[in-house]
């Protein structure tokens, strides 16, 4: 009998290892959070199983700290639309134990995400006129609904909500970085101004909600971006705004299965999600969240309808939008000009908010509508890349 029990125990242990969740690697050269990991549970994990798993992880972590090993344990928990997971700081033995739980889908290192922006000299805001005129022009033509009733979640470096561009339509939502409700880089304020500013914005009546996930250097961990998406979905659901919301992420980093997975769930929940393609002049399939096929991935165009030299390209790109020398709001008042796919993505978010208000279409169907309205005018867009440029359908 003893021999039988020994064999059974060994068999169960072998089965556990065989069924262990994959611990994903990050691309070479990616900047990672030391000992930081993201854990994603399988879709069929119940709330009770998830709770039990977290209690078990806490117990493991408690034993680790009792042994004098460093580790912070679980920091953020994600639980929405059957997406359950968490992130934290763990030693390698703990991560190995976690990956052996059959309820875990995968584990991946927590990597650093960065904003996609360059600061350039001041110039006129040509992007607005370009997206409302088939053949160019200097006037911005739009319907008076102008995004009224639509909420825009700016998952970024924060927003100067008191800037006159927002006319009281901007609020702080969540700060996942620090205790400073401010924009340390100017990036998020510029992005928000393009989406819904009174002068520089497309959807001039939309509401801006600041979700701070990037620090004063324009960086943040993947786990923090996921937490920002999680918060945005829950907030929109609580206020009955899921299908009348857009979420913009002008940021990106190395490929992340976890970030792509959670971003896709935001769209499945009913939101429109625009993301920047990246500024490395490479295939955007290598980046996240740009490589997630269900999002609207936006590359950057120039004033003469060319591909911006820095813009990423590839089959993951859905549209081009103005991204070179874009004038918009800056913290503290006034304006500044920036370039990058970070500037292209909010043009798409703004037109998305505009169309949701004007045509009444739900957020998760807007990317298709944007592609239907777009025009094939981009010259030399890149290998296996669309030539279609964002257009608001004004008829001009």
Curated annotation (Swiss-Prot):
Inhibitor I9 domain location: 37-114
Give the matching PANTHER family: CEREVISIN-RELATED, PEPTIDASE S8
> Where in the sequence does glycosylation occur per the annotation?
230, 248, 392
Gene3D superfamilies from the UniProt entry: Peptidase S8 propeptide/proteinase inhibitor I9, Peptidase S8/S53 domain
> Any chance you could tell me the propeptide residue ranges?
21-116
- At the top level, the lineage of the source is Eukaryota
Q: Where in the cell is it found?
A: Secreted
* Name of the gene encoding the protein in the UniProt record: SUB5
A Gene Ontology MF term for this entry?
serine-type endopeptidase activity
Secretion signal span: 1-20
Family the entry assigns: Belongs to the peptidase S8 family.
Q: Which residues form the active site?
A: 156 (charge relay system), 187 (charge relay system), 342 (charge relay system)
Q: What is the documented function of this protein? A: Secreted subtilisin-like serine protease with keratinolytic activity that contributes to pathogenicity.
The main enzyme category here is hydrolase
Q: Which GO terms describe its cellular component?
A: extracellular region
Q: Cross-referenced Pfam families, in alphabetical order?
A: Inhibitor_I9, Peptidase_S8
Q: Please report the name of this protein according to its UniProt entry.
A: Subtilisin-like protease 5
Q: What is its EC number?
A: 3.4.21.-
Chief location category: secreted
């Amino acid at each position: 009998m003893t021999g039988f029990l020994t064999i059974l125990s060994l068999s169960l242990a072998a089965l556990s290892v065989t069924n262990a969740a994959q611990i994903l690697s990050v691309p070479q050269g990616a900047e990672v959070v030391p000992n930081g990991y993201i854990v994603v549970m399988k879709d069929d994990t119940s709330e009770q199983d998830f709770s039990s798993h977290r209690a078990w992880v806490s117990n493991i972590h408690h034993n680790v700290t009792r042994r004098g090993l460093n580790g912070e344990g679980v920091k953020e928990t994600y639980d929405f639309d059957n997406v359950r997971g968490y992130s934290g700081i763990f030693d390698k033995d703990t991560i190995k134990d976690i990956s052996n739980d059959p309820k875990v889908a995968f584990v991946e290192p927590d990597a650093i995400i960065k904003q996609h922006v360059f600061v350039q000299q001041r110039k006129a805001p040509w992007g607005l006129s370009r997206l409302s005129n088939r053949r160019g022009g200097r006037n911005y033509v739009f319907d008076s609904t102008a995004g009224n009733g639509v909420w825009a979640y700016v998952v970024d470096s924060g927003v100067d909500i008191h800037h006159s561009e927002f006319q009281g339509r901007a609020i702080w939502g969540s700060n996942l970085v620090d205790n400073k409700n401010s924009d340390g880089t100017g990036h998020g304020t510029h992005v928000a101004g393009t989406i819904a500013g009174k002068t520089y914005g497309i959807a001039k009546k939309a509401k801006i909600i600041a979700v701070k996930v990037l620090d004063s250097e324009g960086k943040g961990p993947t786990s923090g971006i996921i937490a920002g998406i999680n918060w945005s979905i829950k907030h929109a659901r609580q206020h009955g705004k899921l299908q009348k919301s857009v979420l913009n992420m002008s940021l990106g980093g190395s490929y992340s299965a976890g970030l792509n997975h959670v971003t896709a769930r935001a769209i499945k929940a009913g939101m429109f999600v625009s993301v920047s393609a990246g500024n490395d002049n490479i295939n955007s399939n290598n980046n996240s969240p740009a490589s997630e096929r269900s999002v609207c991935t936006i590359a950057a165009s120039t004033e003469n309808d060319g591909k911006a030299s820095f813009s990423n390209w590839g089959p993951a790109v859905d549209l081009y939008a103005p991204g070179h020398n874009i004038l918009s709001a800056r913290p503290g008042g006034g304006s500044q000009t920036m370039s990058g796919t970070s500037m292209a993505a909010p043009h798409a978010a703004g037109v998305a908010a505009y169309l949701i208000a004007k045509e009444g279409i739900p957020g998760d169907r807007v990317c298709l509508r944007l592609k239907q309205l777009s025009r094939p005018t981009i010259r030399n867009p890149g290998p296996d890349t669309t030539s279609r440029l964002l257009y608001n359908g004004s008829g001009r």
